[in-house]
């Protein structure tokens, strides 16, 4: 509606919930890095920080797909129909990979991780998409009931 503010109550609640989900999955990645990084030469805190950084970056890239619509778009053509969003995701992923896998590591103070830990990063970031899409499905269902 014309007179409705940009930041409505529902919109702010959605932002808060989505931010909390991303934060929770980032903390899970950090604590996983602390646990598995204890035996690594780089040290547990550095491994945990690297995992949190990578998870947060990848989560924000993936969150662009979540932000396309108020209704769930997971497993629909609509999810990938914006070529500029797809391109920006790929560029962002390439930049993150350059930070994690190439000689840019010292600049960002990140360390080499095991393949399993990279899998945890991807898993935690992907879980954000799934969890937020489920919440959007629930919210859409509840709106229809009203």
Which residues does each predicted region cover?
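C-terminal transmembrane helices and immediately adjacent loops/tails
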Residues: 1-146
């Amino acid at each position: 509606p014309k007179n409705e503010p940009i930041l409505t109550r529902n919109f702010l609640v959605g932002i808060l919930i989505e931010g909390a989900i991303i934060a929770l999955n980032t903390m899970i990645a950090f604590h996983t890095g602390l646990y598995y990084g204890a035996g690594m030469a780089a040290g547990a805190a550095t491994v945990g920080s690297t995992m949190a950084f990578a998870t947060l970056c990848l989560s924000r890239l993936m969150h662009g797909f979540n932000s396309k619509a108020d209704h769930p778009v997971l497993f629909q053509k609509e999810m990938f129909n914006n070529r500029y969003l797809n391109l920006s995701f790929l560029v962002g992923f390439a930049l993150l990979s350059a930070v994690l896998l190439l000689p840019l590591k010292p600049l960002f103070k990140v360390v080499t991780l095991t393949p399993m830990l990279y899998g945890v990063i991807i898993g935690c970031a992907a879980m954000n998409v799934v969890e937020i899409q489920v919440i959007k499905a629930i919210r859409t269902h509840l709106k229809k009931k009203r």
